[in-house]
Amino acid sequence: MAPTQSKVRIHNLAEAHEKTLRAFPIEVEQNPEGKKLLVKQIRIRTLGHADHSNDSICFLNTYGFIKEAVSQTEFMRAGQKSESKNTLTACMLPFGPGPNIGSPQKMLEYAEDIKIHVRKTAGCKEQIVFSLDRTPQVFRGFQFPRDRYACVPSDKYIKSPGKLVAGPNYCYIITFLSLTFCPSSQKFKVPRPVLNFRSTRMRGIHLEIIMKITCSENSPIRKTLITDDLENGPKASVWIHLCNLYKGRNPIKIYDEAYFAEKCKQMLLSVGISDLWGPTIAVHANGKIPKSASLYFNSRGWALHPIADASPTMAKQLWSIGCEIMEVNAILQGSDYSALVDHPDVIYRKIRIDPAKKQYAHSKWNPFKKAISMPNLTDDSI
């Protein structure tokens, strides 16, 4: 029989981060030929006490579409415009952290000059390689333009990677820009090897984030959500690995569930959500961090967890729908798999939720429903 569970809830949100996350309102206009065009937009947010000083940084995230690039071997006469290729699928590509931008409103205009190629490859998993061929100066301080390429699992940033086949050249067209200003002290993403580490001498602490999803009643996404609470709407559960706690070797101490629950309480954890590397869970430890957990936080007690790493499917759903953090639980489990299956979960329900940053608001744009053709995703320079 499966082990029973007890829970501990976290009541407040991380300062400077919201419990909601807003998406882009969709605006459509017609060109002179009568075709419907999707209006490109930029969203600018400031978290906490971040301003345009030297102590704050800017996260840049992009949303758009992948299409087949125009062939460079076509014959063209003078004055003829290259024909648009069909849009294949929606895509998100985080540019990562960068310098503080003094005039962010102009970045949407400069984004039209960015040229990004998209290719498939394979390792132990199917992968997508984004390579930057051309970028304006204003973008070059961000992480992706500095690296010039990014290789990720194919399902991480692309809605339908199965539509990309061998042979054609593909490009990524940016339609939405999301800029988030935050203090530089909050920039810390836990290294993947640290997150994957397990040991028989450790107990693992995970966070379960329960989010209310704001989607329509006829949305196909509802089939993937928790719908047993009709009054409060559909919900989704996302788990992230927070840290490991050392059991210790002191024969006098009792390293039971109460001991680890007390350690969790002493950290005074708080949680919020923002658009950094895509939808990202921000965790702040306001109290005492155990020595064995120090690798999972920066010196200010912050840790950022992109949902695209923890749950790619859920992250892609949040491109087009809103969410609000309703509940956060800390779960204590055995770190080693053998200990995990033999011991029950201990769940701590007193994790704080930031009331200003607990929502990811609803958007009318839905990359999971082909409702409108978007021929404006053409660029003669591509």
From Swiss-Prot:
Superkingdom of origin organism: Viruses
GO MF annotations, alphabetized: structural constituent of virion
Subcellular localization, as worded in the UniProt entry: Virion
Biological process per Gene Ontology, one example term: virion assembly
A GO cellular component entry from the record: viral envelope
InterPro entries xrefs: Matrix_C, Matrix_N, Matrix_Paramyxo_C, Matrix_Paramyxo_N
Record's keyword terms, sorted: Viral envelope protein, Viral matrix protein, Virion
Pfam family, one: Matrix_Paramyxo_C
Similarity-based family: Belongs to the morbillivirus/respirovirus/rubulavirus M protein family.
Function of the molecule: The M protein has a crucial role in virus assembly and interacts with the RNP complex as well as with the viral membrane.
This protein's name: Matrix protein
Gene source species: Human parainfluenza 4a virus (strain Toshiba) (HPIV-4a)
Organism taxonomic ancestry: Viruses, Riboviria, Orthornavirae, Negarnaviricota, Haploviricotina
